[in-house]
């Protein structure tokens, strides 16, 4: 994947990010290129070695086909999940870390439904908020709209599916 300054990409754990610059740094006498990513949510800048960008999960924003798949995932029936809180939390954490937008959508769907049915622990509420933030950021970019509209779209899809 070729990265250019000004491209918008998705970075796992943080969501949408803008490539602000491509820097060359010398580490242990070796010149390496780094992508300087400005995360859309919050005031965070991340530097990722260009060689490892795909390995750590930096990818393009989903297109219309990918968006349709995300909506299918959000509408899909509830998946079987571990009843043990710590196992469920760990499984969801792994899905978020994968950087796969469909796995993030699964986390949002499952935690949202669990919240509607039984409520969530404080840790799972934070995880749901983080997963929603990542998904809303990507939906906003894919739909070419703002976060508020993307959040409305997400809420409508979730409500219609339940």
UniProtKB/Swiss-Prot annotation:
InterPro entries linked: CarD-like/TRCF_RID, CarD-like/TRCF_RID_sf, CarD-like_C, CarD-like_regulator, CarD_C
Effect of loss of the gene: Essential for growth, it cannot be disrupted.
One Pfam family named in its UniProt record: CarD_TRCF_RID
Conditions for induction: Induced by DNA damage and starvation.
Entry's Gene Ontology BP terms: rRNA transcription
Gene3D superfamilies assigned: 2.40.10.170, CarD-like, C-terminal domain (1.20.58.1290)
Taxonomy, superkingdom: Bacteria
Function: Controls rRNA transcription by binding to the RNA polymerase (RNAP). Required for the stringent response to starvation, oxidative and genotoxic stresses as well as control of rRNA under normal growth conditions.
Subunit structure of this chain's protein: Interacts directly with the N-terminus of the RNA polymerase subunit beta (RpoB).
Family: Belongs to the CarD family.
Protein name in UniProt: RNA polymerase-binding transcription factor CarD
Native species: Mycolicibacterium smegmatis (strain ATCC 700084 / mc(2)155)
Lineage: Bacteria, Bacillati, Actinomycetota, Actinomycetes, Mycobacteriales
Primary gene name: carD
């Amino acid at each position: 994947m070729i990265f250019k300054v000004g491209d918008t990409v998705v970075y796992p754990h943080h969501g949408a990010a803008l490539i602000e610059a491509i820097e060359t740094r010398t580490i242990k006498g070796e010149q390496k290129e780094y992508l300087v990513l400005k995360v859309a949510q919050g005031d965070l800048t991340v530097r990722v070695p260009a060689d490892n960008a795909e390995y750590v999960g930096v990818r393009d924003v989903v297109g219309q086909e990918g968006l349709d798949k995300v909506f299918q995932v959000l509408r899909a029936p509830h998946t079987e999940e571990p009843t043990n809180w710590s196992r469920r939390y760990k499984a969801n954490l792994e899905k978020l870390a994968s950087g796969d937008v469909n796995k993030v959508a699964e986390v949002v769907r499952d935690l949202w439904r669990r919240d509607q049915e039984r409520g969530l622990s404080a840790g799972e509420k934070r995880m749901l908020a983080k997963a929603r933030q990542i998904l809303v950021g990507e939906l906003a970019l894919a739909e070419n709209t703002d976060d508020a509209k993307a959040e409305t779209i997400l809420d409508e899809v979730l409500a219609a599916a339940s």
